[in-house]
Amino acid sequence: MIVDTSAVVALVQGERPHATLVAAALAGAHSPVMSAPTVAECLIVLTARHGPVARTIFERLRSEIGLSVSSFTAEHAAATQRAFLRYGKGRHRAALNFGDCMTYATAQLGHQPLLAVGNDFPQTDLEFRGVVGYWPGVA
């Protein structure tokens, strides 16, 4: 399962009902993964809300949920551009931003479900059940 920044923020901030749904999805996940650029985005968002302790908060959560970090390759970059062309802000109602496009690309290339909170990813071709989006034809 690929984890988006929005899911981590919902969990850390205790956003109801999303935090509960994210925690349940993570409890059922084998090995949740976040791409390296998404980790950077997540740290920036958490730092804006929590200051310098954001790194500690993130690393503690990462350890608790067994979150691994994946590399981001040229193939990911090309898939990110394709995601932007199809679903990017100003091009589609999903209005995916740069970080969203990277997360979408990571999930797409890995054929992995996507854990996210918000109204953007459900506007893509992912089929959402709660906070987890699945690729069409894959449950």
Curated annotation (Swiss-Prot):
InterPro entries cross-referenced by the UniProt entry: PIN-like_dom_sf (IPR029060), PIN_dom (IPR002716), Type_II_TA_system_RNase (IPR050556), VapC_family (IPR022907)
Domain PINc: 1-127
Residues that bind Mg(2+): D4, D100
GO MF term list: magnesium ion binding; RNA nuclease activity
Pfam families (UniProt xref): PIN
Cofactor: Mg(2+)
Record keyword Magnesium present: yes
UniProt entry tagged with the keyword Magnesium: yes
Domain of life: Bacteria
E.C. number(s) listed in UniProt: 3.1.-.-
Enzyme class: hydrolase
Keyword line: Hydrolase, Magnesium, Metal-binding, Nuclease, Toxin-antitoxin system
Entry function: Toxic component of a type II toxin-antitoxin (TA) system. An RNase.
Family assignment from sequence similarity: Belongs to the PINc/VapC protein family.
Name of the molecule in the record: VapC ribonuclease Mb2004c
